[in-house]
């Protein structure tokens, strides 16, 4: 047995091997040490007879019926677990029982419900990068979702954005991707996912064949991948990894979704985090995020669909309006919406249920849940009949899965056991054979009595009895006192005693075998019938998946309508105008966290022409960041098809939303706050377009005043300039000198958050008004924050001193054109460089680098 273990273990050296021995999964050697440490299991040994403890084989084990709990703990810690089962019956096995690994469980290949988060997809990813071509593929094997994205050029930001969007638990890479360091660093540090090397799995022809076979394609062109060889390699490598770990049919992975430009908005990591789309920046939890506000879904698949919609805002006004029209109908019909929500509330996770059915890991309870889901479908279709919107009409045409409901309802008892191998799953009447065996098992004594009576009549021996003992089993006892009677020819003598003879007949032997093996036969037959039923249901995987997807969409639409009613949202007008007009907008998350204070709504108006850039000034803590974030969130909410927290809103679709809000030192990568800020600014200016929305908060604050002011102005002017960018931009700053740009830079306007002083106190009014703020009230904010009075008093003294010095004739004046003086005009080298530079040809990053170079030269 040890040799068998070592042979199997050698094939799965990167896994913890769960080796089936009877009712336990055992681990040996180093696996045992790891499992003992990680699972708090007692470490024992099989060979206690060995004198030297160091030579003994360490081992530990877990019961097979509760192994999922232990496996889940190991997977959560990043381990891979190989399940090695007995693949033949130990009773009939000749010699050593055959064993083999039937499945490898990894963080990205989990299907067991106890290891999965209901409202969150569990993605496995693959990345391919070579010769400037990059692609990524993602699959949630618990549901069958399979997505592919391809990117052109050497810029890795797109693939990083997709990694951030899907957040895979596990990622496989080819050598080229691993050598970038950018991809593995992002995956490990930002996502915390397990990394695997793909080896030779990315060879194009093999990958193309694998993709075609899996999705039933005659050629790669049918999937839209004819011009995307990198995507084919990523998808093929992912399919191979799934096949190697799952070792079973993947029939539920049947549709490939190609992420192409023009469908979904791309969101970078910084934007996703700073806007707190799915988790709070402070706690990392769902509470405090946009997802938390919008998630009134009632089904697990609806929860995952909502998360996907938030992560994938739409770019097509037509597709957005399709969702909004459906939400509007549900919003207006409280009765139907309430009944739909009540019906959805009792539905289980159809997507993952059908996945387990296909994989062969479903149990009786799973089928009962699937049956109950199917039972609710006719009512949902009935409730949707009056609606006219295209999306709700489409959903109402879902397959009600009547055949699946009928088959499960006929076969499976209402309260089946958890295990499918212990019997008790099938209803009476489903199988005559099972019913007969159950009757024998439950009425064995009656069967024996009936045979005994039958034999008495047949033989005429009134004292004939049928008895049983553990040595001889069942026997017919004929007392010698019965006299000279004729013993039937089919009676076979088993034992002779002093006063009686014991016989058996073929019929009695068959009854004995039946009685003694009835339970085992029942278990095997019920298991076989159950697996046959699962196979029949699995053949309808396409219908179940389509219905589950429709229910998930309906769940999200109902949630949007319910949130809109509860929170007083309005239906936005979405178009391609480039306008962004929000009346009395509110921050969707902040307003839900305020208990006794009413949220102060504010207007926003931006467009692609005369009102492109809004400079927002005002005190710290007054709400500048909240105001800008709410504008971004309202825009994103509209583009996922949700109503928005405002009195009215016109949202011209934006292609990207970028944010540069707040920062903290990235010590792990050696980046300071300022360096991180500049990296993010460079990324924004490199990828934004005139159709983007930019949210920039206090650019340049991480360096000296004049350096920061210079950078802030340069960035702001670049954003405003139609020839360079011309994007809709909200720009919060404490550099009040930038207010002078209104009127001198086309498209720039000043706004401020009002505040007023009452004695020594500062009152935040939270209202956005036209014009620049006249003061930052920094000292007043310091006082509000609890800075000691002596420090505040000293600060006021210094402030008066600095203001007096600034007003003095000796104070250095800015240049006449109000341009910020970056360098001493007498610095010849700096002047020469400036005169010879074509500023209009510089990229944002080149401009920042040039600015840094000039600063160093000016300082000597």
Regions found by a protein language model. Give the residues of each.
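Charged, surface-exposed helical/loop "interaction arms" that form contiguous linear patches used
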Residues: 359, 363, 376, 393, ...
């Amino acid at each position: 047995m040890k040799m068998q273990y070592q042979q199997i273990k050698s094939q799965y050296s990167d896994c913890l091997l769960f080796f089936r021995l009877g009712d336990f999964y055992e681990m040996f050697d180093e696996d045992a040490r790891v499992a003992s440490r990680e699972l708090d299991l007692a470490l024992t040994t099989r060979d206690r007879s060995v004198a030297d403890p160091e030579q003994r084989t360490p081992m530990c084990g877990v019961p097979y019926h509760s192994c999922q709990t232990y496996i889940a703990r190991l997977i959560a810690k990043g381990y891979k677990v190989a399940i090695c089962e007995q693949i033949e019956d130990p009773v009939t096995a000749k010699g050593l029982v055959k064993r083999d690994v039937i499945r490898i469980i990894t963080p990205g290949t989990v299907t067991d419900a106890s290891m999965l988060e209901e409202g969150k997809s569990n993605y496995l990813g693959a990345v391919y990068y070579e010769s400037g071509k990059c692609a990524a593929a993602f699959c949630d094997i618990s549901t069958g979702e399979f997505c592919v994205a391809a990117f052109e050029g050497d810029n890795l930001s797109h693939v990083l954005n997709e990694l951030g969007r899907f957040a895979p638990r596990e990622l496989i890479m080819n050598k080229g991707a691993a050598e970038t360091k950018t991809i593995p660093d992002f995956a490990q540090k930002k996502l915390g996912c397990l990394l695997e090397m793909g080896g030779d799995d990315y060879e194009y022809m093999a990958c193309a064949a694998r993709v075609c076979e899996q999705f039933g394609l005659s050629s790669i062109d049918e999937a839209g991948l004819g011009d995307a060889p990198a995507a084919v390699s990523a998808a093929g490598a992912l399919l191979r990894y799934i096949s190697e770990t799952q070792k079973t049919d993947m029939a539920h992975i049947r549709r490939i979704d190609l992420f192409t430009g023009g469908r979904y908005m791309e969101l970078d990591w910084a934007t996703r985090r700073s806007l707190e789309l799915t988790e709070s920046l402070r706690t990392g939890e769902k509470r405090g995020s946009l997802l938390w506000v919008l998630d009134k879904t009632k089904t697990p698949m609806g929860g995952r669909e909502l998360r996907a919609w938030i992560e994938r805002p739409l770019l097509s006004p037509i597709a957005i309006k399709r969702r909004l029209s459906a939400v509007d109908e549900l919003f207006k019909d409280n009765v139907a919406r309430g009944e739909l929500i009540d019906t959805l509330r009792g539905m289980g996770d159809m997507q993952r249920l059908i996945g387990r059915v296909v994989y062969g890991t479903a149990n009786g309870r799973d089928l009962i849940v699937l049956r109950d889901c199917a039972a609710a479908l006719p009512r949902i279709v009935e409730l949707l009949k009056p609606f006219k919107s295209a999306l709700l009409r489409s959903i109402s045409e879902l397959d009600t899965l009547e055949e699946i409901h009928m088959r499960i309802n006929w076969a499976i008892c209402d309260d089946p056991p958890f295990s499918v191998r212990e019997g008790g799953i099938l209803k009476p009447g489903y199988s005559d054979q099972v019913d007969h065996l159950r009757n024998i098992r439950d009425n064995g004594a009656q069967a024996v009595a009936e045979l005994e009576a039958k034999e008495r009549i047949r033989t005429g021996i009134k004292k004939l009895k049928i008895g049983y003992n553990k040595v001889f089993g069942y026997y017919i006892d004929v007392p010698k006192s019965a006299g000279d009677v004729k013993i039937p020819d089919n009676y076979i003598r088993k034992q002779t005693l002093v006063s009686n003879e014991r016989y058996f007949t073929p019929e009695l032997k068959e009854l004995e075998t039946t009685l003694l093996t009835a339970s085992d036969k029942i278990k095997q037959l019920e298991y076989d019938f159950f697996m046959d039923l699962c196979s029949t249901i699995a053949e309808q995987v396409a219908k179940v998946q389509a219905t589950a997807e429709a229910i998930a969409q309906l769940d999200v639409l109902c949630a949007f309508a319910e949130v809109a009613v509860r929170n007083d949202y309005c239906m936005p007008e979405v178009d391609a105008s480039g306008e962004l007009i929000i009346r009395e907008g509110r921050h969707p998350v902040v307003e839900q966290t305020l208990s006794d204070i009413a949220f102060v709504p504010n207007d926003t108006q931006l467009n692609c022409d005369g009102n492109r850039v809004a400079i927002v000034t005002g005190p710290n803590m007054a709400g500048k960041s909240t105001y800008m974030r709410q504008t971004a969130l309202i825009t994103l909410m509209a583009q996922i098809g949700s109503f928005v927290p405002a009195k009215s809103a016109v949202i011209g679709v934006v292609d990207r939303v970028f944010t540069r809000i707040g920062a903290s030192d990235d010590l792990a990568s050696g980046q300071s706050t300022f360096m991180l800020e500049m990296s993010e600014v460079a990324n924004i200016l490199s990828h934004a377009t005139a159709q983007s929305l930019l949210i920039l908060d206090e650019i340049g604050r991480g360096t000296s005043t004049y350096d920061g002011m210079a950078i802030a102005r340069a960035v702001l002017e670049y954003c405003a300039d139609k020839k360079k960018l011309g994007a809709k931009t909200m720009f919060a700053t404490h550099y009040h000198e930038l207010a002078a740009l209104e009127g001198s830079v086309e498209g720039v306007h000043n706004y401020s958050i009002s505040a007023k002083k009452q004695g020594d106190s500062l009152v935040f009014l939270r209202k956005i008004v036209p014009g620049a703020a006249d003061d930052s009230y920094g000292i007043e904010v310091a006082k509000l924050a609890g800075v000691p009075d002596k420090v505040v008093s000293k600060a006021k003294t210094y402030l008066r001193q600095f203001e007096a010095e600034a007003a003095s004739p000796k104070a250095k004046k800015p240049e006449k054109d109000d341009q910020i003086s970056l360098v001493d005009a007498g610095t010849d080298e700096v002047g020469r460089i400036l005169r010879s530079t074509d500023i209009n040809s510089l990229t944002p990053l080149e401009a920042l680098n040039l600015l840094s170079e000039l600063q160093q030269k000016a300082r000597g």
